[in-house]
Amino acid sequence: MPTFNQLVRKGRKAAKKKSTAPALQKGFNSLKKVQTDISCPQKRGVCTVVKTTTPKKPNSALRKIARVRLTNGIEVTAYIPGIGHNLQEHSVVLIRGGRVKDLPGVRYHIIRGTLDAAGVAKRMQGRSKYGAKRPKSSAAAK
């Protein structure tokens, strides 16, 4: 335990908060071929591997994930939300931050309905999270 005088001289340092999505906080200057510190809400990338994996202990499923090489050169593992997808190797996708609790090492989500990732088909509720268009309603026309 420090003395009062030691605290007056030195002071306490605030603990630095670690980022939950560090790959979104790096940019890449392609002219100078150097990484830059630019934060982005989303980043574009190309799928290198699309596969399924099993979750941690109490849960059981086949979760769909993709390994994505981002425009800043970093390769990350991203979760593909929703039922069914059309992604394969070389698909261009947009990723956002957000981990999957039962998949270790998966810190990013692929945004459905943008670039090569199609929206979830026949989705009626929570459509905006899965890139599903509003269905043409025949009841409203009558």
UniProtKB/Swiss-Prot annotation:
Q: Name one GO cellular component term.
A: small ribosomal subunit
What superkingdom does the record give?
Answer: Bacteria
Q: Which Gene3D superfamilies match?
A: Nucleic acid-binding proteins
Q: Residue spans with biased composition (Basic residues)? A: 9-19
Q: Which GO terms describe its biological process?
A: translation
InterPro entries from the entry? NA-bd_OB-fold, Ribosomal_uS12, Ribosomal_uS12_bac
The record's similarity note reads: Belongs to the universal ribosomal protein uS12 family.
> Known PANTHER family for this protein?
30S RIBOSOMAL PROTEIN S12 FAMILY MEMBER (PTHR11652)
Q: What NCBIfam families does this protein's entry cite?
A: rpsL_bact
What name goes with this protein? Small ribosomal subunit protein uS12
